[in-house]
From Swiss-Prot:
Keywords: Cytoplasm, RNA-binding. This is SsrA-binding protein. Residues 137-159 have a biased composition (Basic and acidic residues). Required for rescue of stalled ribosomes mediated by trans-translation. Binds to transfer-messenger RNA (tmRNA), required for stable association of tmRNA with ribosomes. tmRNA and SmpB together mimic tRNA shape, replacing the anticodon stem-loop with SmpB. tmRNA is encoded by the ssrA gene; the 2 termini fold to resemble tRNA(Ala) and it encodes a 'tag peptide', a short internal open reading frame. During trans-translation Ala-aminoacylated tmRNA acts like a tRNA, entering the A-site of stalled ribosomes, displacing the stalled mRNA. It comes from the Bacteria. It is found in: Cytoplasm. Gene3D superfamilies: 2.40.280.10. Residues 133-159 are annotated as: Disordered. NCBIfam families: PRK05422.1, smpB. Belongs to the SmpB family. It comes from Sinorhizobium medicae (strain WSM419) (Ensifer medicae). GO terms for cellular component: cytosol. One of its GO terms (biological process) is trans-translation. GO terms for molecular function: RNA binding.
Length: 159
């Protein structure tokens, strides 16, 4: 058995919300399981999913993923799933309470960052707790990114 520090985690990313880090200031991230049907898992394994317009919300003491798009599995015929149905997220009670408190008291948002398969083959969602950025914050982020690109170009040219 290998020592604990030498474990490698292999994550196959299926869908990523690339705009989330631009539109939100990420405070904390959580790993949540997804309650999926068989055809949804097969569709995910094909790498077809979109979480760009999705969000998570708290309803009745549970966290739900809303508006995520998992296309129909072509070989499933009449037993297919709804493409944009609400999907329950599996989190521990302590994590749910922490997220509810942050959303209700501090006005934060629950943003899905990416869906991936962990080393055991389970579909997981990386969920972020974040605050929405104002327009001037977004401009500042893009200016900083442009400056870093220019700086790297200059350093590369000078050798």
């Amino acid at each position: 058995m290998a020592p604990k520090g030498s474990e490698r985690t292999v994550k196959k990313v299926v869908a990523e919300n690339r705009k989330a880090r631009f539109n939100y200031e990420i405070v904390d991230t959580y790993e949540a399981g997804l309650v999926l049907t068989g055809t949804e898992v097969k569709s995910l394994r094909e790498g077809k999913a979109n979480i760009a317009e999705s969000y998570a919300t708290d309803e009745g003491g549970e966290i739900w993923l809303i508006n995520s798009y998992l296309p129909e599995y072509l070989q499933a015929n009449r037993f297919n799933h709804e493409t944009r149905r609400r999907r329950k997220l599996l989190l521990s009670r302590r994590e749910v309470n922490r997220l509810q408190g942050a959303v209700n008291r501090e006005g934060m948002s629950l943003i899905p960052l990416r869906i991936y398969f962990n080393e055991r083959g389970r579909a997981k969602l990386e969920l972020a707790l974040g605050k929405g950025k104002k327009l001037h914050d977004k401009r500042e982020t893009s200016k900083e990114r442009d400056w870093n690109r220019q700086k790297n170009r200059l350093l590369k040219e000078r050798g």
